[in-house]
Amino acid sequence: DIHPIVTTHHIGKKYILLTNEETNTDLTQIAVTQLKAGETAEEHLHPTMEEFFLFQKGDAIMTVNKEQIVCSSGDFISIPANTLHSLKAVTDIEIITIGCALR
């Protein structure tokens, strides 16, 4: 069983499916992330990692370099390293998140 943990942004919860310790790749993590309506991952960046989001359910607003993007089920967002981004759940959301370390 995969047990949920609090996200690194101290909101919502995530179920970690795979980490870099479990593979010989540049992958940092694959997780299913769940946020409740109104929860926000404040603006931040990752200097050594690219991040990818596949929205599974719900509606959210992803802000990338000050540009707001409305996201819903089926949407895929790619965030390059060193790119400011934030995420606000408009409704309860579920996202597959993938992090990949830079080479």
What do these predicted regions represent?
Residues A31-P47:
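Conserved short histidine dyad/triad with adjacent acidic residue
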